[in-house]
């Protein structure tokens, strides 16, 4: 559940064409969505797909936003801590970071192109209790910031900040 996008996105195991057409896909070689130190669960989704929004408006997500991951075993609440734009082959950006419990969403960037990847990196918030959708949406309304997002852009070993408008 991504409240800022008002999006319940089903997540499937493996980034196959079929799974990506139906929702988000847990990337192979990344952590299972169980939480815990030394994990990074990486979920890829299209930035829109044949009429389905999916992560179409990913640029609206802002630092501090909540993302809730529900599995058959647990409900984990994460808070967005970083926004990044990377090259498609930059696997370093999705590696486990020692001691951290991360959830990373990845999608194509810019919209309608696939020359880069837009990452939303969120860290587990063990003190946050799951809320109702209405409570989450109210929090989003209260915290909306229309200012451009400060996004870290990593290209060919260099890092820069770029402003990305929340509305495309």
Task: Kindly give the residue locations of the regions a language model identified.
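Solvent-exposed, non-transmembrane regions of membrane-associated and secreted proteins
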Residues: 1-168
